């Protein structure tokens, strides 16, 4: 289960990354997601528990911003369901991995989003 502690750990990890590279980004923290907004695009981290309906959240984000990038952080990733629903995600992170692996994956996605090499 992706609990509140891990959600705030994710928020702190993202803010450290932004501070490290001195990026101009707005960070919005919602109950089950974190949104990073630049002048041209947005990146959404969806952090839901096993019983939540993440398809609904992804489609809600897509309705408001077709070009938004979305990363899903969930346990027990069902790639077939994600593929069949045509969710168009930038990435999926299995939160059952260690925090070090999750942090590495988050950093990789942020590098890609902000074009940092």
What kind of region is each of these model predictions?
Residues 75-79, 83-117:
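Output/docking surface of receiver
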Residues 11, 39-70, 76-80:
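Conserved phosphotransfer microenvironments
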Residues 14-22, 61-62, 106-110:
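Hydrophobic, Leu/Ile/Phe/Ala-enriched alpha-helical segments that form helix-helix packing faces
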Residues 4-30:
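Two-component/phosphorelay signaling modules centered on CheY-like receiver
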Residues 27-43:
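Acidic, metal-coordinating helix/loop segments flanking the phosphotransfer/catalytic sites
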């Amino acid at each position: 289960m992706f609990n509140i502690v891990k959600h705030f750990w994710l928020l702190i990890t993202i803010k450290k990354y932004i501070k490290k590279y001195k990026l101009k980004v707005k960070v919005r923290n919602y109950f089950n997601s974190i949104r990073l907004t630049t002048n041209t695009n947005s990146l959404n981290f969806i952090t839901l528990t096993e019983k939540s309906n993440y398809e609904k959240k992804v489609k809600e984000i897509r309705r408001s911003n077709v070009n938004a990038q979305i990363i899903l952080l969930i346990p027990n990733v069902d790639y077939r369901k994600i593929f069949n629903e045509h969710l168009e995600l930038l990435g999926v992170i299995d939160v059952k991995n260690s925090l070090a692996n999750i942090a590495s994956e988050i950093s990789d996605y942020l590098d890609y989003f902000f074009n940092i090499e």
